[in-house]
């Protein structure tokens, strides 16, 4: 797996849809792919939405992601759900939206552990830091105030590097803001001004 492979897959989807250009957005891993797409296919990217994501997970990212992926192999996906839920959703959201939380957990545990390991390795290797300065399209960066997976500091770093970008910090939200506050995320993306 590589973010470049996923970005080229996204280009193929746009080709099949008959779209020459699009606003490209993604959350978490999808944000890494969106950023890579904007770098690889700048002429096709008219706007960018980077949600609860980062350009790089830092100096220890390869080891950190390898450890998480290996945990899926040794303990299984179910053993990781408690950790994941606390990163994905605020306590209040969990209490008030049990069906959404349960569905997210079901999707997570349905992952093949070996595929999850390879995805973790991909995220550990991903470093799009140098691509940030080349982003010249309207860009909205969104992060949950309590996002521990890709903290506000990571979003601020991208915001500082992408000239003209906007940064929105969602109060009391964590890592899966598209599920926690979908209307807010939709509004922000719909307001991307592509001229």
Question: Language-model segments: which ranges?
Answer:
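Conserved alpha/beta-hydrolase catalytic His-Asp/Glu region
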Residues: 59-64, 75-134
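Conserved alpha/beta-hydrolase "acid-adjacent" motif
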Residues: 148-154
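Flexible "cap/lid" loop of the alpha/beta hydrolase fold
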Residues: 35-40, 44-81, 88
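Catalytic active-site module of serine/aspartate enzymes centered on a nucleophile-bearing elbow/loop
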Residues: 164-195
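Short beta-strand/loop motif that positions the catalytic acidic residue
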Residues: 135, 141-143, 147
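Gly/Ala-rich beta-loop-alpha elbow adjacent to hydrolase catalytic centers
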Residues: 26, 30, 34
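Active-site loop/oxyanion-hole signature of alpha/beta-hydrolase fold enzymes
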Residues: 1-25, 187
């Amino acid at each position: 797996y590589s973010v470049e492979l996923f970005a080229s897959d996204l280009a193929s989807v746009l080709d099949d849809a008959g779209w020459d250009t699009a606003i490209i957005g993604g959350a978490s891993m999808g944000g890494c792919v969106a950023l890579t797409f904007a770098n690889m296919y700048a002429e096709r990217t008219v706007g960018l939405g980077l949600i609860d994501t980062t350009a790089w997970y830092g100096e220890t990212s390869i080891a950190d992601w390898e450890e998480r992926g290996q945990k899926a192999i040794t303990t299984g996906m179910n053993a990781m759900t408690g950790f994941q839920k606390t990163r994905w959703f605020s306590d209040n959201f969990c209490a008030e939206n049990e069906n959404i939380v349960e569905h997210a957990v079901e999707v997570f545990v349905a992952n093949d552990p070996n595929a999850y390991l390879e995805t973790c390795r991909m995220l550990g290797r991903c470093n799009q830091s140098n691509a940030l300065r080349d982003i010249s399209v309207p860009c909205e960066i969104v992060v949950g105030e309590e996002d521990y997976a890709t903290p506000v500091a990571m979003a601020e770093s991208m915001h500082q590097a992408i000239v003209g970008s906007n940064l929105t910090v969602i109060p009391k939200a964590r890592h899966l803001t598209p599920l926690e506050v979908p209307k807010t995320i939709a509004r922000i993306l719909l307001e991307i001004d592509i001229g």
